[in-house]
């Protein structure tokens, strides 16, 4: 059992994916609060927008790590979400700060539904990725 760079990448990805799961849960709860009108859209967007860039940067960091470790299958599984993150950030509304959510448009029913679906899809992806990284870490540690 040898400790390789690939094993380190899987361990770090496992820990950071746990943080991304919490980000996705926060995202889902925040948009549910907006849907049920428990919270002001301006306050909600002010709490959601600072989480966008760290989430995207953590995921991009995963992709760079797995590229350096030559874990091609793992990189291939992460590339569609990375491409989506890049597209989503490039097509964001024009605002003064970094973020995706504009308080003036977030209460539109179609945008709110889209953001909720996005949160649920990301939660599913991060949960599956968590268990895949756990399997990959065990496999790399045992097979070396």
Curated annotation (Swiss-Prot):
Protein's UniProt keywords contain Transmembrane: yes
Principal cellular location given in the protein's record: endoplasmic reticulum
GO-annotated cellular components: endoplasmic reticulum membrane; endoplasmic reticulum-Golgi intermediate compartment membrane; ER to Golgi transport vesicle membrane; Golgi membrane
Origin superkingdom: Eukaryota
A GO biological process held by the record: signal transduction
UniProt membrane topology term: Multi-pass membrane protein
Tissues where this protein is expressed: Highly expressed in heart, liver, skeletal muscle, pancreas, adrenal medulla and cortex, thyroid, testis, spleen, appendix, peripheral blood lymphocytes and bone marrow. Lower expression found in brain, placenta, lung, kidney, ovary, small intestine, stomach, lymph node, thymus and fetal liver. Expression is up-regulated in dorsolateral prefrontal cortex of patients with schizophrenia (postmortem brain study).
Location within or outside the cell: Endoplasmic reticulum membrane; Golgi apparatus membrane
UniProt keyword terms in alphabetical order: Endoplasmic reticulum, ER-Golgi transport, Golgi apparatus, Membrane, Transmembrane, Transmembrane helix, Transport
Transmembrane segments annotated in the record for this chain: 11-31, 57-77, 123-143
Residues on Cytoplasmic side: 1-10, 78-122
A Pfam family this chain is assigned to: Cornichon
Residue intervals on the Lumenal side: 32-56, 144
One term of GO molecular function: signaling receptor binding
PROSITE patterns: CORNICHON
Primary role: Involved in the selective transport and maturation of TGF-alpha family proteins.
Oligomeric form and interacting partners: Interacts with AREG immature precursor and with immature TGFA, i.e. with a prosegment and lacking full N-glycosylation, but not with the fully N-glycosylated form. In the Golgi apparatus, may form a complex with GORASP55 and transmembrane TGFA.
Family of this protein: Belongs to the cornichon family.
Name the UniProt record assigns to this protein: Protein cornichon homolog 1
Native organism: Homo sapiens
């Amino acid at each position: 059992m040898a400790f390789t760079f690939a094993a380190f990448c899987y361990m770090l990805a496992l820990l950071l994916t746990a943080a991304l799961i919490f980000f996705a849960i926060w995202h889902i709860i925040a948009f549910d609060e907006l849907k049920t009108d428990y919270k002001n859209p301006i306050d909600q967007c002010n709490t959601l927008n600072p989480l966008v860039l760290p989430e995207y940067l953590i995921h991009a960091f995963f992709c760079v790590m797995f590229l350096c470790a030559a874990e091609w299958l793992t990189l291939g599984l992460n590339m569609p979400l990375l491409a989506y993150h890049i597209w989503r950030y490039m097509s964001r509304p024009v605002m003064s700060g970094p973020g995706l959510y504009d308080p003036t448009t977030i209460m539109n029913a179609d945008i709110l539904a889209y953001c909720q679906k996005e949160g649920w899809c990301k939660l599913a992806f991060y949960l599956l990725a968590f268990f895949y990284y756990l399997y990959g870490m065990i496999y790399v540690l045992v097979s070396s």
